[in-house]
Amino acid sequence: MEDKNSVIVFKNVSFQYQSDASFTLKDVSFSIPKGQWTSIVGHNGSGKSTIAKLMIGIEKVKSGEIFYNNQTITDDNFEKLRKDIGIVFQNPDNQFVGSIVKYDVAFGLENHAVPHDEMHRRVGEALKQVDMLERADYEPNALSGGQKQRVAIASVLALNPSVIILDEATSMLDPDARQNLLDLVRKVKSEHNITIISITHDLSEAMEADHVIVMNKGTVYKEGTAIEIFDHAEELTTIGLDLPFPIKINQMLGYQTSFLTYEGLVDQL
């Protein structure tokens, strides 16, 4: 398969957790554009988190194919390809493995047998990028949820990935911490040309994305830019998704534009 503009491609992928269970994913096909931010959204049970598990190899497809940089992912090449993909999970406490911040960032580098001098350099650079260098010697219980997620992103950045997956990474944060983390992710994407994949039920997060895939009942319901997706805002509510606040207000006021950020809403008012 030749698709130079996509980093990950799902082709007719189906998956079930048990052989006698219903399919969680049903003949799913989509492409993740290189260097862009793709948001995969859906309600609980839509199949979006299963997609993340397949991307990082926690689960394997039952039928269909997954391509990474035009290579079919197989048992033989998976470990090599997997090193290019980092993931940040929902609960920051569950992914903190070091006794202090800098040891947590170093953990993945140790597993990859990175030399000590290079490890020290990478840890410092990664923490600096996420504005956590001054807290390098802090214990995890001294950090807020948002700061822990910054450390998780630093741990991923230290490994020089091409792709970062955010699996509901903002869902346990307060609104300010959530927005700060999303701003950081956009900065990281821009500075390093990293592909971002956010798995979320929150359509507000999808407004940050370049490309949006909406999942429903194990299938791709809609796909397009954020503007294209929110042009069908009412349809999104019928599959259990909650519209972002500015779009709700926009509808109440009877404005024509479906897609609207907080800044745009303020300007419009």
Swiss-Prot record:
InterPro entries: AAA+_ATPase (IPR003593), ABC_transporter-like_ATP-bd (IPR003439), ABC_transporter-like_CS (IPR017871), ABC_transpr_CbiO/EcfA_su (IPR015856), ECF_ABC_transporter_ATP-bd (IPR050095), EcfA_1 (IPR030947), P-loop_NTPase (IPR027417). It holds the Pfam family ABC_tran. Keywords: ATP-binding, Cell membrane, Membrane, Nucleotide-binding, Translocase, Transport. One of its GO terms (cellular component) is ATP-binding cassette (ABC) transporter complex. Its main location: membrane. ATP binds at G42, H43, N44, G45, S46, G47, K48, S49. Residues 8-242 form the ABC transporter domain. SUPFAM superfamilies: P-loop containing nucleoside triphosphate hydrolases (SSF52540). It is an enzyme of class 7 (translocase). One of its GO terms (molecular function) is ATP binding. Its EC number is 7.-.-.-. Forms a stable energy-coupling factor (ECF) transporter complex composed of 2 membrane-embedded substrate-binding proteins (S component), 2 ATP-binding proteins (A component) and 2 transmembrane proteins (T component). ATP-binding (A) component of a common energy-coupling factor (ECF) ABC-transporter complex. Unlike classic ABC transporters this ECF transporter provides the energy necessary to transport a number of different substrates. Belongs to the ABC transporter superfamily. Energy-coupling factor EcfA family. This is Energy-coupling factor transporter ATP-binding protein EcfA1.
